[in-house]
Every structure is written in C-alpha cells, then in structure tokens.
C-alpha cells in the first residue's frame, strides 16, 4: 500500500503537468486560430547573456495562415525572410545572397514559425507553458538552436515575442499598429529572387 502511494505521489504530478501542457498548447493554438492574417510594425532589442544591449532594430512583420510569414528588418541593416507556404527565403541584400529552406527546417531553427503552422505532429515536439498572457514555447530536443520563444497577447492581440537562443542572447520584438492584411497585400508572401545574387538552396523535405 505504501509503495502504491509512493508511485502515485510521483506519477500524479507528471500526469497533471502533461495535461496542463496539452491544455496550454490548445489555448495558444486557439488564440492563433483567431489570427488568419496579421501585419504589424516591430521594434527589436537584442541583449547578450549579461543583459547588455547589443543591437536595436525595426521593421515590418506579417503572417497569414497557413504557413506564410514575412519579416522585413529595415534598421539597422536590411534583411528579409519570406515564407510562401512551402519554402522559406532568407535574403541578405548587403551580402547579395539568398538562402532557401523548406518550412519544416525553418520551424526546427525557430519555433516562431509555429505561429502559422498547425500540424499536430510538429507541435508535439514542443512544450507550451502559460503565464499571465505570455506563452513560452520550448523545443523538447536538446539539439535545437533556440532555447525558447515567448509569445504574448493583450486579449487576442499579439503584442510581443521574445526569443532566447542557446548562447543566452535574448531578442525582444514589440509589435504595434496591428492590422489584418488586405487581399492586395498578400503578394508580400511571394519572394522573387533578385538578379545577380548567390542562392544557397538547403531544401530537403516537403511541408507536413
């Protein structure tokens, strides 16, 4: 009897924890399901492991379900990330280089891509916790390059994202001027490779 109680004492918290994580994952996915499209301005602040500010920036962020997002950093140095529903294009104008990978590779590189991805098998690779309107998404794999991504809401409005990498650097993105995307703006999710740039094609798989 005492042994049985000991097993229960160990097992019940694990069961409750597993249920809570599943529930919080469901709450986050429900909130994301309310956002079929979104466009916003962002400001970015990057701090190192000692909490020293090492970079500030700004730009435009947009997403559309399914599997489309747009990330245009305009300051201090321009860079562009476009997910067109299947492939993810990363353009560095200064280096005159474009890298392209499939969406599943991008999700493995950063859970931020989960914002527009609803595949249950992919979501099962992450734990989700919720504290005061901020959901923390952490990969279960120890090989992931990102430690966690926090996604914060004010009601159902996405307001902030915080990304922490394995080196302890933290990137905070504050969103403002959030609007839905008009039909005329959907072309932002289509990337055209500029002339005279090098292309690094890393695509491996199809999208789940």
Swiss-Prot record:
Domain of life: Bacteria
Localization in the cell: Periplasm
Span of the signal peptide: 1-22
UniProt keyword annotations, A-Z: Chaperone, Periplasm, Protein transport, Signal, Transport
InterPro entries named among the record's database cross-references: LolA/LolB/LppX (IPR029046), OM_lipoprot_carrier_LolA-like (IPR004564), OM_lipoprot_carrier_LolA_Pbac (IPR018323)
Magnesium recorded as keyword: no
Stated role: Participates in the translocation of lipoproteins from the inner membrane to the outer membrane. Only forms a complex with a lipoprotein if the residue after the N-terminal Cys is not an aspartate (The Asp acts as a targeting signal to indicate that the lipoprotein should stay in the inner membrane).
UniProt similarity note: Belongs to the LolA family.
Name assigned to this protein: Outer-membrane lipoprotein carrier protein
Organism annotation: Shewanella sediminis (strain HAW-EB3)
């Amino acid at each position: 009897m005492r042994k049985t109680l000991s097993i229960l004492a160990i097992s019940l918290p694990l069961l409750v924890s597993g249920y809570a994580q599943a529930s919080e994952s469901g709450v986050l996915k429900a909130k994301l399901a309310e956002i079929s499209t979104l466009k916003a301005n962002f400001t970015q602040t990057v701090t190192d492991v000692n909490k020293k500010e090492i970079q500030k920036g700004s730009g435009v962020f947009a997403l559309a379900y399914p599997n489309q997002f747009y990330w245009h950093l305009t300051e201090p140095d321009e860079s562009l990330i476009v997910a067109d529903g299947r492939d993810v294009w990363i353009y560095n104008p200064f280096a005159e280089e474009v890298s392209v990978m499939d969406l599943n590779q991008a999700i493995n590189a950063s859970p931020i891509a989960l914002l527009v991805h609803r595949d249950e098998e992919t979501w099962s690779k992450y734990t989700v916790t919720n504290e005061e309107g901020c959901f923390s998404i952490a990969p279960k794999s120890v090989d992931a390059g990102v430690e966690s991504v926090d996604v914060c809401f004010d009601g159902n409005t996405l307001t902030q994202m915080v990304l922490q990498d394995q080196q302890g650097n933290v990137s905070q993105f504050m969103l403002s001027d959030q609007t839905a995307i008009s039909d005329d703006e959907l072309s932002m999710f289509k990337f055209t490779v500029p002339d005279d740039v090098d292309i690094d094609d890393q695509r491996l798989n199809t999208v789940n």
